[in-house]
Amino acid sequence: MNQQTQRVSDGSAHYDSIIIGAGHNGLVCAAYLAKSGQRVLVLEASDTPGGLGASREFHPGFHASVAHSISHFSQNVASDLNLAAHGFEATTETLPTIGLSADSQHVVVHKGSLSGTSSDDADAYQDYSRLMHRFADMLKPFWLKTMPRIGSSNLADLMTFAHLGLNIRRMGKENMREFMRIATLPARDLMDEYFDNDILKATLSWDGVIGSKMAPRSPNSAVLALLYRMAEESRGAHAIPAGGVNGLVESLSASATASGAEIRCNAGVDRVLIDGNGDGLLAKGVQLADGETIKADRIISATDPRRTFLKLVGVEHLEIGFTNRIRRLRCDGFVAKLHVALNGLPEFDRLDRADGRIIIAPDMDAIEFAYDHAKHGELPEKPVMEIVIPSVHDASLAPAGQHVLSAHVMYVPYRLKEGWTDSARDQICERTIDMLAQYAPGIREQILHQEFLTPVDLEQHYRVTGGHWHHADFKMDQMLMMRPTYEAAQYSTPIPGLHLCAAGCHPGGDITGAAGHNAAREILR
Amino acid sequence: MNNYDAIIIGAGHNGLTNAAYLAKAGLNVVLLEKNNFIGGASCSQELHEGWMYSSYSYVCSMMRQAIHRDLDLARHGLLIVPYLGTVNFGDGDERFFSYHDEEAAHLELKRHSPRDADAMHRFQADLTRYAQLIRKTLMRTPPDPTSFRPRDIKELLFFAQQLWNLGEKEIYEYVRFFTISAAEFLDDYFESDLVKAAMASAGIIGTALGVYSPGSSYILLHHVMGDVDGSIGAWGLPRGGMGAISDSLASALQQHGGELRTNAGVKQVLVENRKAVGVVLENGDEIRAGIVVSNLDAKRTFTRIMDRNDLPEGIYEKADKFKIRGSSGKVNIALSGMPKFTGLPDNRYINCGGLTFTGSLETMERAYDCWKHGRFSDDPFTKGSFRRPGIRPSHLPASTGCRILCSTARPNLVLGNGRRKIAISSAKLSSIKSHVTARGSRT
């Protein structure tokens, strides 16, 4: 990786665009801009690109990335940037999603069908999928569109509204009514309406709540999150691309550099340089941690909005109302990450092979209980989690015969009431492994090393405010033309020359590339 | 005579209002009530000899002034006496008084937090703005957005225009306000836990949401949506208890020639040729009318008093899915005298308003957590009010007219289980008792 990242700026270099942060959205944006002929520099604070998708050696010989699978990476982006030529396989076999059961049968959701449930549930799943796919298809075009500003009389903006209205209308009266009814329903109500099996309900609601401060009983945005995640062809099924998520990051880096973008690592940005005169403000460059300044026509931030405006720009350059709207963004993370180095493949009770995406949440109440603790700033007694063993799919992640277990653990509060300490981290890590051991009894003896990253750790290691996956909660008031706030929702900001291109913008988080793509389109407009 | 222009099922206050308006418009109406009393939740009942309770609903503010005027309810005996203030009992000796008098309210806020005292102006101004849009829609029929009927399209355009007129910034603030949690919204303004809890307590009662649930912020509109006699945001108790509202509506109905029958439960709505044509009562009587209006909830209407085969396809299933989740219980207590509360300078304020018992939003949320999981809360959110002598019904003795009622987060799964009922009563009482030096109270 590093040979392509070590081009040294001579101080006088001038770029068309500087992108702050080489997370996947920053790389997507860089690749599009470079492809269109811009001179682009990507500045990354850590020593490798990829952000939360970057692979790290957490124990000698064992590698993992915080994001451990992808589910709805935009196929448009993959083909535009010719990622296949750079090593990314879009058509990777999808993983079965397995809801683990302690005493009866595991529930497996794979390729549009169910096993391990009653035939009633299996039939209901067909109805459920048909309806959800219908709605997901209806919304799909909008994830790759720039959301218009309300009140705009621009024809293209009005067309976007008309398009959305038409798409909803085209579904027919019954579907339209049903969409309006369920769009803001808590995941729990939706699942209860369709299914009986508790594990199935917990497993399917998982994708509605993970990543945000939400649980199955929370109304408003869980169903939209589910639909967002079903937008691409895999219909929300997860996959591990060749080389893991890091493989995708590498293909993006390769595509960007092939088009002429420079990626500089170990180059953390301290400040965005703002020029002010009688005509207003203008972002004209950045200052690195070591004092070096680099000039560019525009600065594009792939870091989260709070960090961008409050740390890199500084409130002295912002209008107070705007500052307040950025300050009140809700971006406290509630997902922790567990990486375990194992001396063999863990054996889960009555599961042939742990090669799927495994959910440990016996029912929706278990998820809700874990959330109840976390929302009060406490550690959950019984954490719930999503597990992947990436080394099953990519042997290079661990020494021969050994394995990496990667788990998203919910709900672990960013703001722990007593404050985060090493012993608090150990405590929640122990509880998580206890849960694991209930389903994989021999796992404790297999553990060589474990690493538990709380949201605070994620914030520190990955420079993402609140340790939040999505840079800001996926909630109604932080979506669409309100993400991150209305003056910065079209990828530009109140400061001319400063743009946003990552998960803090429409359409939001997860590894999709959509925000990076949309931002590049707006910049090139 | 068993032939009318309109039959209204259920003499709750909406049924009464509907019947009164139809009667006033010249229709020959009959209002059918299953109980032997009218008013539904808006009733005054003598549950204990000599004590008249507002046995279910307990305070009035949201009743629309237009109805008051149109039906001339004052002439039919309705007089709402405003609260002068309310008191929130926090943990220990913490107390927060909210007064309708602005200066007193400001001074009291300052005692808790000077910052919050300043923020209150912003809070009130913002809420009042949000309420304006809703106020405009309250007396209109919501449109069916899937319909192409001119009336629906016109109404939809009306809503769109009202929203559009707000301007960009306001639209976003509205979306935010109506979708975030009460706790998140209050955090934007206040720092004192007690103040925040007191503010949230006005509306959270009766919802199946916690103060941390997305979308619960709208409950704060209870501070500004209603009014007493035009005084925005005021709360009050009707003279004679909540039943006085129903009595005045019934009087208006009868004045306009409408008929009111109690002990007349409807067994089934009669449908002929896909049109409702009347009802069959529980006693077997048949009443016919061109219009049948149900004041029962949608679920009861479609799943209990209608034959599934009479309904268009899908309606039964939808009504069955309709979510109705009770979250509050109520205790009515007859006291031999005014209890003395700790931490109050005197009983002036509680004589003139409501009481809430909650120390923080977190406490309220924890009570909701218990409800969610079907458990009783050890520390339920409790709200009450006294019937003060000044608004006692004139036929009761002056000395003993006081009462507490409490609503609290509690599981609805076990409603009706006598022993459990006592358990929740005592949980609620114990939470009050820590603030009360009770004098010979009896339940």
Labelled PLM ranges:
Chain A
Residues 13, 240-242, 261, 268-399:
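Mid-domain catalytic core of redox enzymes
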Residues 8-151, 471:
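N-terminal glycine-rich phosphate/pyrophosphate-binding loop and immediately adjacent elements
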Residues 92, 265-267:
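Short loop/edge segments at beta-strand edges and connector loops
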Residues 1-17, 35-36, 479-481, 485-486, ...:
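Extreme N-terminal leader/targeting segments of oxidoreductases
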Residues 503-524:
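A conserved FAD-binding loop/helix module that cradles the flavin
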Residues 197, 201-216, 380-388, 442-506:
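A glycine-rich dinucleotide-binding beta-alpha-beta segment and adjacent secondary-structure elements
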Residues 133-259, 464-479:
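Active-site/ligand-binding neighborhood in enzyme catalytic cores
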Residues 343-461:
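C-terminal segments that line or cap access tunnels to active or ligand-binding sites in enzymes
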